[in-house]
Amino acid sequence: MYRLYWLDEHNPRSPFPPAEQAMDEPNGLLAVGGDLSPVRLEQAYRRGIFPWYGPGQPILWWSPDPRCIFRPGWLHVSRRLARRLRTGAFRMSLDTDFTGVISACAAPREDQAGTWIVPEMMHAYEALFELGIAHSVECWDRDGELVGGLYGVALSGAFFGESMFSRRSDASKACMAWLSAQLHRWGFALFDCQVSSPHLRRMGAVDVSRSRFLAQLQQALVLPHRRGPWRFDRDLDPVAIHRQHQTRTTAPEVLYGS
């Protein structure tokens, strides 16, 4: 019988149990407690583990099976999204307003009872941003209003998406497309989305087993690390990059492993 592992909140370097020991129900719950220090968070991400909990709960650590991922540069860009990206409806930026993005992601939504991005979580990722490990993508309209964004953590050749928001149609999709294209150009090997959703699957995300994800993560972690702040390349064309890959018929098992 599996026993839930309790982490020492006074020792951020105390080890996590192997991700393979996560519970089946609830899917992926691995450990409780600890802290949200940069040392602890980096250790978690390197092991395929992330924090996710609500107000009034202790810190909960997860590694679900299966895992939802993209291969950078292989998102599905619809014709409608391609038109939005090429007409100049949005202005995109990287690492320009991290606090604005995470605050918008934490705001209550109509389809949710509450938010899991509690204040201590926000402060923890803002600390990672100051260290150049966490990053944000911003989507601005023509009036200069922040209308979409996402944030996540980058270690070596792996990017771990945490949350995104959209106040205009296609704004969060634009963030995904631009970030995926830039990660592809930089040679990133893995874009982790944690848990699958219909929205992510429509954009080309796939579910892989936890064991496959952990193997791909270890391969990505040997690649060079790119510390922030990041900026988009001036000549980046996300539509061209993704369309180039969409014209190929590469099977998912070739892209992501069987």
UniProtKB/Swiss-Prot annotation:
It is found in: Cytoplasm. Its EC number is 2.3.2.6. Disulfide bonds: none annotated. It comes from the Bacteria. GO terms for biological process: protein catabolic process. InterPro entries: Acyl_CoA_acyltransferase (IPR016181), Leu/Phe-tRNA_Trfase (IPR004616), Leu/Phe-tRNA_Trfase_C (IPR042203), Leu/Phe-tRNA_Trfase_N (IPR042221). One of its GO terms (molecular function) is leucyl-tRNA--protein transferase activity. Signal peptide: none annotated. It catalyses: N-terminal L-lysyl-[protein] + L-leucyl-tRNA(Leu) = N-terminal L-leucyl-L-lysyl-[protein] + tRNA(Leu) + H(+); N-terminal L-arginyl-[protein] + L-leucyl-tRNA(Leu) = N-terminal L-leucyl-L-arginyl-[protein] + tRNA(Leu) + H(+); L-phenylalanyl-tRNA(Phe) + an N-terminal L-alpha-aminoacyl-[protein] = an N-terminal L-phenylalanyl-L-alpha-aminoacyl-[protein] + tRNA(Phe). The keyword Cytoplasm applies. Keywords: Acyltransferase, Cytoplasm, Transferase. PANTHER family: LEUCYL/PHENYLALANYL-TRNA--PROTEIN TRANSFERASE, LEUCYL_PHENYLALANYL-TRNA--PROTEIN TRANSFERASE. Belongs to the L/F-transferase family. Functions in the N-end rule pathway of protein degradation where it conjugates Leu, Phe and, less efficiently, Met from aminoacyl-tRNAs to the N-termini of proteins containing an N-terminal arginine or lysine. This is Leucyl/phenylalanyl-tRNA--protein transferase. It comes from Alkalilimnicola ehrlichii (strain ATCC BAA-1101 / DSM 17681 / MLHE-1).
